[in-house]
Design a protein with these regions (language model features):
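Surface-exposed, charge/polar-rich loops and edge strands
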Residues: 1-220
């Protein structure tokens, strides 16, 4: 369902008893190319290419990327006021994982303009929390379509992609776990010896161990 007028939206995600509130908006590909939208992962070209094909075929952003921004008191207050006083347009719990999803429309033009002004003048950067390949692909699609449009002015829809932007004080960094199912023909001792070629491997006991510093990993 497409609104007749441009709006911003508030998205609340509830999981494990915690709720975080983000703003659904469009991000500009130039902000990514110019480093205002900051990444912390290297991306693979084949994955970017795959996502570009999807965007070009559907001509849509079907899933928002997840950005974080330094929390801003005035934005927090505006979001809180809408959440407490306005009726959400959608409110449901997903059967698959039990997560709650709630959406509000920001209708007031003055509020929309003020939020845009704060992000333009007072928020120095956005940070990609999830969606590095989708962000890179969206920026590349914008560049390609710009190159093919002699009348490009920067306001075309292909310059933008959908994002949900959460304040950093509502985020929780959780474990990023991966399972090694196959040692590729190596014994456990040989596998650990191979790791020693690149890492310093130390035994730390039999209890759960969480990394405590940069470039440290735990393995079981």
């Amino acid at each position: 369902v497409q609104d007749e007028e441009e709006k911003l939206y508030i998205y609340a995600q509830t999981m494990d008893g915690r709720t975080r509130y983000g703003i659904v908006a469009c991000a500009h590909s130039e902000d990514y190319m110019n480093g205002i939208i900051k990444k912390h992962e290297l991306t693979r070209k084949d994955k970017e290419d795959d996502r570009m094909i999807h965007v070009n075929i559907t001509n849509a952003n079907v899933e928002p990327v997840f950005f974080a921004y330094p929390a801003h008191k005035e934005i927090d207050q505006m979001v809180d006021n809408i959440v407490k006083n306005e009726k959400p347009i959608y409110d449901f719990v997903a059967k698959e994982d039990g997560f709650g999803h709630t959406f509000w429309v920001i209708e007031d033009e003055a509020t929309i303009k003020r939020i845009e002004e704060i992000f333009e003048k007072e928020i120095p950067a956005l940070y990609v929390a999830d969606g590095h390949h989708r962000t890179a692909a969206a920026a590349r699609v914008g560049q390609e379509r710009r190159a093919g449009n002699p009348n490009h002015n920067g306001n075309e829809e292909y310059n933008y992609f959908m994002a949900v932007i959460f304040p950093d004080n509502q985020l929780k960094i959780i474990d990023y776990n991966r399972v090694v199912k196959d040692l590729n023909g190596l014994s456990e001792e040989e596998f650990l010896a191979k790791l020693n070629d690149t890492f310093v491997v130390e035994k730390v006991g039999t209890e759960i161990y969480k990394p405590s510093k940069l470039h440290e990993f735990s393995m079981y």
